[in-house]
Amino acid sequence: MPRALSIKFDNTYMDLYDELPESKLLYDEEFSYLLDAVRQNGVCVVDFLTLTPKELARLIQRSINEVFRFQQLLVHEYNEKYLEICEKNSISPDNGPECFTTADVAMDELLGGGIFTHGITEIFGESSTGKSQLLMQLALSVQLSEPAGGLGGKCVYITTEGDLPTQRLESMLSSRPAYEKLGITQSNIFTVSCNDLINQEHIINVQLPILLERSKGSIKLVIIDSISHHLRVELQNKSFRESQENKNYLDRMAEKLQILAHDYSLSVVVANQVGDKPLANSPVAHRTYVTDYDYQLGWLVGWKNSTILYRQMNSLLGASSNNDEILSDDEDYMLIERVMSTVNDRNYDFFSKKKPPIIENKTVERNSSSPISRQSKKRKFDYRVPNLGLTWSNHVSTRILLQKSFKASTIIQRGEAHLYKGGDSASFWQVKRTMKVVYSTFAKPGQIAYQITKRGIETA
């Protein structure tokens, strides 16, 4: 019986049987001597798929016609295997994605119906934007019956930054009396905490699949809060090799979550933290192309169009160029400045002594002696990006951005600042929260204002 064709890999041998166990070439008497020559000369399967018959014949000292016949049969078997793997399977409506409500009608409309199964939904944003609030709200709303907008399912809540805040969940339940009548309780939420990356990996790859298998379809939502907490701390990225290994790790993790979402018809919703994307300070101009990641980044992370154009022009013309006019003015900041300058008995420099609360976006200030420059001093551009990069983004079906910024308070907008008797200008600002669908398989990009209440996340 002829020997199996071997692949040389990292100083070991892996035979053709491992690659194509059903291959008829393994035991074809016609190629027995060729297989012996292949083994003796250390020629691998990849060589047969990439080299010409002439080059192969020289390597193994066999006739070019014999090599050509073997090569053609091997390629044919690989093509058949590829077509078998890529065969399309029709999906019946019963097995397609379903959605459940967020417990807010306006949010559901923004998301194209709600949170969908068979995929990964990412919620990202800075701290105190309400990511965990929304996740806990989903852990309750998924328990609603299908006529009420839910899936009648249970939830698995995986935390990486501490224990699940059960008191906040209880507060949400008590503020929604109808939930108690519908049988929605914390007992339908399985919770587990992981304190390091190894523990997180074990939960996703071992414990979670076992729990889902035993639940027999009763679990409809898996929440991870947050997905990047341990990854960004423990994954080293000091070399190109480590960078590639990290990408492979993220791919495997995301694919595992997608497989679970598909096999068990459930939703995977994760929170993601953010990092900074500084503005390039290179004085040398360089052209960016549509295919460049930096060119596409703004649309993948929810930046404003003015920020995207500003960064592109900064790269094209260099950091020394003045592109401030591209950015939008902070109208609320300028409004408060004008109001403060007219308030009697408030004779202090607003910009030097009184700063507004921390603003979400970085600003650009223009140095000019023109009277108009004082009105155009504050310019905003986006610089926050979700962690884990493009590798992770490619696996996300819906990306939701939660933003927290500040706007002029009602007393300023109504022109009633003169009625305010205090001395703290921070009272002239109020929180502005925005939910933005960056991209989604099920909905168009859009945004809506929201607020955090006792009931959870509600549209303003």
UniProtKB/Swiss-Prot annotation:
Pfam families: Rad51. One of its GO terms (molecular function) is DNA strand exchange activity. It is found in: Nucleus. It comes from the Eukaryota. The keyword Cell wall biogenesis/degradation does not apply. ATP binds at G125, E126, S127, S128, T129, G130, K131, S132. Its main location: nucleus. InterPro entries: AAA+_ATPase, DNA_recomb/repair_Rad51_C, P-loop_NTPase, RecA_ATP-bd, XRCC3-like_C. PROSITE patterns: RECA_2 (PS50162). One of its GO terms (biological process) is mitotic recombination. The keyword Chaperone does not apply. Participates in the repair of X-ray-induced damage to DNA and in meiosis. It may act in part by stabilizing a repair complex of other RAD genes. PANTHER family: RE19845P, RECA/RAD51/RADA DNA STRAND-PAIRING FAMILY MEMBER. This is DNA repair protein RAD57. It comes from Saccharomyces cerevisiae (strain ATCC 204508 / S288c).
